[in-house]
Amino acid sequence: MVTERQNEILNLIIDIFTKTHEPVGSKALQDSINSSSATIRNDMAALEKQGLLEKAHTSSGRKPSVAGFQYFVKHSLSFDRLAENELYEVIKAFDHEFFNLEDILQQAADLLTKLSGCTVVALDVEPSRQRLTAFDIVVLSQHTALAVFTLDESNTITSQFMIPRNFLKEDLDRLKGLVRERFLGQTVLDIHYKIRTEIPQIIQRYFTTTDNVIQLFEHIFGDIFKENVILSGKVQLLEFSDLTAYQFFDDPQKVAFEIRDSLAEDQMQSVRVADSRESCLADLTLISSKFLIPYRGFGVLAVVGPVNLDYQRLVSQMNVVNRVLTMKLTDFYRYLSSNHYEVH
């Protein structure tokens, strides 16, 4: 059982240690804790016995253990604070015109990496929740074509493919018509299901020769099922982790799954301290925070860093970036949904 004073001591030690990265002795706490040095030492010993503090090899002071950081996150971390001193820098970073969503998310990730010194990932709305709102096929040459998907009326994905040898121009038109008839307005998750269940049953109604049609569907639709992962500060991993963690971030889909898995459906923020099922991330911290993408749903900003982070400062920085990012996205999508030629 951690007493109120012991909790205060633990919080203060974490605050000092995350700023100095030096073990903390009882004398360093006396100005802030209204107790004698002996009492503080006894409380520090009690915290050590509970596994929340640990001895340092080079000093008589103590430092927070992994369990100590986990306790702090669970009992003392405030998720509502804003890093107001960095608000101007964040607003200034977004104070120019962006031409697509990916650039806005990249700016947010780059900015948070700069502020935190950590690796940052930004995710769009989960692919399975997005809806197909437009589809077209553009013939590039005699043998190649480009499938153009628009999701949520704003997110464009393209997939280049070789036109099957047995296809005529009319077959491409039939393919386009089939997609528009069966898939427009459907979620990506529903489309994924229909390609495997409904389409094999009906393609003979549309195509004289059905060879390669299912394979072509799976090929051109493959990219819309994938997460769009925006990454910044990957090299930072090498400062607080090893090569296996660095290489883990070479697989964007695994990275996205790890981040999605850290947040429950109804959870807006999550801090996981040394709590990943991925062995290469087991000694790291993952902080995830959802942000609103107007008209579409929620994206996610995630920070990966060492256990000995200044959690309060970093969460406050993420809150500021999230708020300004949402403001920028609101303006961006309001423009997309307006009449381009209307007089302002």
From Swiss-Prot:
InterPro entries: GAF-like_dom_sf, HrcA, HrcA_C, WH-like_DNA-bd_sf, WH_DNA-bd_sf, WHTH_HrcA_DNA-bd, WHTH_transcript_rep_HrcA_IDD. The keyword Transcription applies. Pfam families: HrcA, HrcA_DNA-bdg. Keywords: Repressor, Stress response, Transcription, Transcription regulation. It comes from the Bacteria. GO terms for biological process: negative regulation of DNA-templated transcription. GO terms for molecular function: DNA binding. Belongs to the HrcA family. PANTHER family: HEAT-INDUCIBLE TRANSCRIPTION REPRESSOR HRCA (PTHR34824:SF1). HAMAP family: HrcA (MF_00081). Negative regulator of class I heat shock genes (grpE-dnaK-dnaJ and groELS operons). Prevents heat-shock induction of these operons. This is Heat-inducible transcription repressor HrcA. It comes from Streptococcus sanguinis (strain SK36). The lineage of its organism: Bacteria, Bacillati, Bacillota, Bacilli, Lactobacillales. The gene is hrcA.
